[in-house]
Swiss-Prot record:
Disulfide links within the chain: none
Biased composition (Gly residues): 779-794
Region (Disordered): 708-727, 768-806
InterPro entries named in the record: AAA+_ATPase, AAA_ATPase_CDC48, AAA_ATPase_domain, AAA_lid_3, Asp_de-COase-like_dom_sf, ATPase_AAA_core, ATPase_AAA_CS, Cdc48_dom2
Function: Necessary for the fragmentation of Golgi stacks during mitosis and for their reassembly after mitosis. Involved in the formation of the nuclear envelope, and of the transitional endoplasmic reticulum (tER). The transfer of membranes from the endoplasmic reticulum to the Golgi apparatus occurs via 50-70 nm transition vesicles which derive from part-rough, part-smooth transitional elements of the endoplasmic reticulum (tER). Vesicle budding from the tER is an ATP-dependent process.
Expression induction: By cold.
Name of the protein in question: Transitional endoplasmic reticulum ATPase
Gene: vcp
Homology family: Belongs to the AAA ATPase family.
Length: 806
């Protein structure tokens, strides 16, 4: 029942986006005949709309564009489609599959005169009379309807020329009859100016903010188009919208699109531009902007970067800012009821804006334009790639799923990076010096999935630009042993990201934190790196001591900032290395920077509790001094899973040696199992060191051999023909034996005993090893026994503890 209610509310909140079905709304289809002023409908649809063959119709497309055409019937056209060629589609700013509306336009007059101009790059090098060759045959006996602002293409004399209708009399549309005067004198129109108007932003150029767009539409379009609605209900239409969100999510873009689509007068104020050095001038600039807008109502005033001109008045020391804020307040209250002026503002720091501006009646609607989710990212990618040539193997959905935390701007950068990579591959065929590029090369360009993969490896979400994170290329294979721990970690991070529905089903929020502890050199940091790489989440690594700075209160601010960034780029793994440096037990250290360390811990504790459950942020801590860590941070709900990472046992040691020597050539007689048996009590780092040293010895021998051979060659040139094989093809047994002479244990038995004791006490104080429910019947107790026993063994490797002493 509840879910039904929610979905109903969703429908209402986006109700304004739904297309109403009317008989005159048709879907654009490719035309068969190439005539620029003909659209064709099915006969049934023409009867329904009461149109006749040869009638003039008015077509309305996107971005308030309209044009006039002649309608003909076409039997092959289905009822809900309309056929038009590319020229008409461009004039309406629509693509195939978009929806346009069509209505009869009976009162089109014959034109007295029209003025058309060619577009410069299509008439280069044409000699002769444009009018005679192109325009006269095009308009002769055709009675074409045209509209001011249309562009049409005329073929003739071996090439095609594009013309733009600059003026018609009577305006805005007329039919070109035999006695209409056609002017085509004047400077040709530059293609750039045309392209700019073509590239205006519309609603369909914005992806990933469907709900917010609906809110904005009902705030802007309803009052501007149908003010009577609000009068009938008896409320004042809302007047201010504040868009806020992280940079790059499309706040300014939305405002532009609204301006283009509503056709209202649009007045852009860039925040800092208003400021002036003369006293009183800044305020008068603001007043002028509002007066201008009221004259041209309905109008939209858009203030970009609002936090520059309306900061909190208590915080600013400048007199000017205060006066500007006051002026803005009075102006927004003084907008007359009748004047349909809407004020929109954008900022990415909504909390630094004066609170008086955020009350109802000024900026009464605050629309949070957040970081898009996977479906939103897919929409954005489709918009950015709709003009790109994509190869067949490109799977945009997968790209959308992998780009966690990317905003629209990052995705745009990603697409252009992929396209550049595609061009680089063809670089050997392109010569920069040439005037033109081969058509073959141009046509063979296409962006493949590999290009996207490459771009993905290059791109970081902009929320994480400062804490730039190299995602390490370490996989689970690089880590020998520790299988239980690996599984725990995968469950911790991957389940909430990949199966959120399961958590909903069982009604629990996933746990958010893990603490690794154990002797140094056992792979705690390595595990965190591997998890960052394996589960497509973003990864922020925080080295403990970095957080502390000399300024009072700055260390805590650093903590806050890091958690904010992680929330913005969710799903995200926060890895605190050397946690003991920032989370010491409180109260012991007196006089350390005025107790700065204590305050940092308090900040971390509050942040960990305040992780809103919606965001997937995981915290992993690693330390080798678990005894001095503040107990408050170890409670369930913060770092709730304490995982002891012991020294590797024999099985794990074999796995570690194999993982280390995966890429090395080793001779057959090296018995790694025996090596593992002998190196009891060695940590993972010690084993790695043995492998490195053996490798180094082999390299040394190889180099010495080469030098010796070079000498022999110089003394005895006749022996050169004999091609000898590589003297040291692989790491031999004696290299390992030599390396073992230098091997040492980095962790003494004493240390290990400490860790063991700690793990033991934790387990006793925390867990009930022998807990059973009282059995009502024998069948019920069986499975629960087994599972609880297994669980205990998993977390603290009880079975492996004995091997540590050997």
């Amino acid at each position: 029942m509840a879910s039904g209610g929610e979905s109903k509310n969703d429908d209402l909140s986006t109700a304004i986006l739904k297309q109403k079905n009317r008989p005159n709304r048709l879907i654009v289809d490719e035309s068969i005949n190439e005539d620029n002023s003909v659209v064709s409908l099915s006969q049934a649809k023409m009867d329904e709309l009461q149109l006749f063959r040869g009638d003039t119709v008015l077509l309305k497309g996107k971005k308030r564009r309209e044009t006039v055409c002649i309608v003909l019937s076409d039997d092959t056209c289905s009822d809900e489609k309309v056929r038009m060629n590319r020229v008409v589609r461009n004039n309406l700013r629509v693509r195939l599959g978009d929806v346009i509306s069509i209505q009869p336009c009976p009162d089109v007059k014959y034109g007295k005169r029209i003025h058309v101009l060619p577009i410069d790059d299509t008439v280069e090098g044409i000699t002769g009379n444009l009018f005679e060759v192109y325009l006269k045959p095009y308009f002769l006996e055709a009675y074409r309807p045209i509209r001011k602002g249309d562009i049409f293409l005329v073929r003739g004399g071996m090439r095609a020329v594009e013309f733009k209708v600059v003026e018609t009399d009577p305006s805005p549309y007329c039919i070109v009859a035999p006695d209409t005067v056609i002017h085509c004198e004047g400077e040709p129109i530059k293609r750039e100016d045309e392209e700019e108007s073509l590239n205006e932003v519309g609603y369909d150029d914005i992806g990933g903010v469907r709900k917010q767009l609906a809110q904005i539409k009902e705030m802007v379009e309803l009052p501007l188009r149908h003010p009577a609605l609000f009068k009938a209900i008896g409320v004042k239409p809302p007047r201010g919208i504040l868009l806020y969100g992280p940079p790059g999510t499309g706040k300014t873009l939305i405002a532009r699109a609204v301006a283009n689509e509503t056709g209202a007068f649009f007045f852009l104020i860039n925040g800092p531009e208003i400021m002036s050095k003369l006293a009183g001038e800044s305020e008068s600039n603001l007043r002028k902007a509002f007066e201008e807008a009221e004259k041209n109502a309905p109008a939209i005033i858009f203030i970009d970067e609002l936090d520059a001109i309306a900061p909190k008045r208590e915080k600013t020391h400048g007199e000017v800012e205060r006066r500007i804020v006051s002026q803005l307040l009075t102006l927004m209250d003084g907008l007359k009821q009748r004047a349909h002026v809407i004020v929109m503002a954008a900022t990415n720091r909504p909390n630094s804006i004066d609170p008086a501006l955020r009350r109802f009646g000024r900026f009464d609607r605050e629309v949070d334009i957040g970081i898009p989710d996977a479906t939103g990212r897919l929409e954005i990618l489709q918009i950015h790639t709709k003009n790109m040539k994509l190869a067949d193997d490109v799977d945009l959905e997968q790209v959308a799923n992998e780009t966690h935390g990317h905003v629209g701007a990052d995705l745009a950068a990603l697409c252009s990076e992929a396209a550049l990579q595609a061009i680089r591959k063809k670089m050997d065929l392109i010569d920069l010096e040439d005037e033109t590029i081969d058509a073959e090369v141009m046509n063979s360009l296409a962006v493949t999935m590999d290009d996207f993969r490459w771009a993905l490896s290059q791109s970081n979400p902009s929320a994480l630009r400062e804490t730039v994170v190299e995602v390490p290329n370490i996989t689970w294979e690089d880590i020998g042993g520790l299988d239980d721990v690996k599984r725990e970690l995968q469950e911790l991070v991957q389940y909430p990201v990949e199966h959120p529905d399961k958590f909903l089903k069982f009604g629990m929020t996933p746990s958010k934190g893990v603490l690794f502890y154990g002797p140094p050199g056992c792979g705690k940091t390595l595990l965190a790196k591997a998890i960052a790489n394996e589960c497509q989440a973003n990864f922020i690594s925080i080295k403990g001591p970095e957080l502390l700075t000399m300024w009072f209160g700055e260390s805590e601010a650093n903590v806050r900032e890091i958690f904010d960034k992680a929330r913005q780029a969710a799903p995200c793994v926060l890895f605190f290395d050397e946690l003991d440096s920032i989370a010491k037990a409180r109260g012991g250290n007196v006089g350390d920077g005025g107790g700065a360390a204590d305050r940092v811990i308090n900040q971390i504790l509050t942040e960990m509790d305040g992780m809103s459950s919606k965001k997937n942020v995981f915290i992993i801590g690693a330390t080798n001094r678990p005894d001095i860590i503040d107990p408050a941070i170890l409670r369930p709900g913060r770092l709730d899973q304490l995982i002891y990472i012991p020294l590797p046992d024999e099985k794990s040691r074999i796995a570690i040696l194999k993982a280390n020597l995966r890429k090395s050539p080793i001779s057959k007689d090296v018995d790694l199992d025996f090596l593992a048996k002998m190196t009891n009590g060695f940590s993972g780092a010690d084993l790695t060191e043995i492998c490195q040293r053996a490798c180094k010895l082999a390299i040394r021998e190889s180099i010495e051999n080469e030098i010796r051979r070079e000498r022999e060659r110089q003394t005895n040139p006749s022996a050169m023909e004999v091609e000898e094989d590589d003297p040291v093809p692989e790491i031999r047994k004696d290299h390992f034996e030599e390396a073992m002479r230098f091997a040492r244990r980095s962790v003494s038995d004493n240390d290990i005993r400490k860790y063991e004791m700690f793990a033991q006490t934790l387990q006793q104080s925390r867990g009930f090893g022998s807990f059973r429910f009282p059995s009502s019947n024998q069948g019920g107790s069986g499975p629960s026994q087994g599972s609880s026993g297994g669980g205990g063994g998993n977390v603290f490797n009880e079975d492996n503890d004995d091997d540590l002493y050997g």
